[in-house]
Amino acid sequence: ADVPGNYPLNTYGNMYYCTILGENEFCKKICKVHGVSYGYCYNSYCWCEYLEGKDINIWDAVKNHCTNTNLYPNGK
């Protein structure tokens, strides 16, 4: 069964380019920033499993998931 997901987008609205296909630490970190726990390099771009539409864009993901008290002193 195919796991749903999406290609996350960076601050420029572009997909994250990756060179090591499959298991990829960079992509895992990117996917965590976008609010999901796992991703990998597919077709030279990071793919995040279970990444929802609302979190594809990095700015949306930060708004939805960031817990930085300097950015959000009163929480969310």
UniProtKB/Swiss-Prot annotation:
Intrachain S-S bonds: 18-41, 27-46, 31-48
Molecular function per GO: sodium channel inhibitor activity; toxin activity
Domain of life: Eukaryota
CDD domains: neurotoxins_LC_scorpion (cd23106)
All copies of domain LCN-type CS-alpha/beta, residue ranges: 3-67
GO CC annotation terms, alphabetical: extracellular region
Function: Binds to sodium channels (Nav) and affects the channel activation process.
Location(s) in or outside the cell: Secreted
UniProt tissue specificity: Expressed by the venom gland.
Keyword annotations from UniProtKB, A to Z: Disulfide bond, Ion channel impairing toxin, Neurotoxin, Secreted, Toxin, Voltage-gated sodium channel impairing toxin
Family membership noted in the UniProt record: Belongs to the long (3 C-C) scorpion toxin superfamily. Sodium channel inhibitor family. Beta subfamily.
Record keyword Secreted present: yes
Protein name: Toxin Acra III-2
Broad class of where this protein is predominantly found: secreted
InterPro entries recorded: LCN-type_CS_alpha_beta_dom, Scorpion_toxin-like_sf, Scorpion_toxinL/defensin
Swiss-Prot/TrEMBL domain comment: Has the structural arrangement of an alpha-helix connected to antiparallel beta-sheets by disulfide bonds (CS-alpha/beta).
Matching Pfam families: Toxin_3
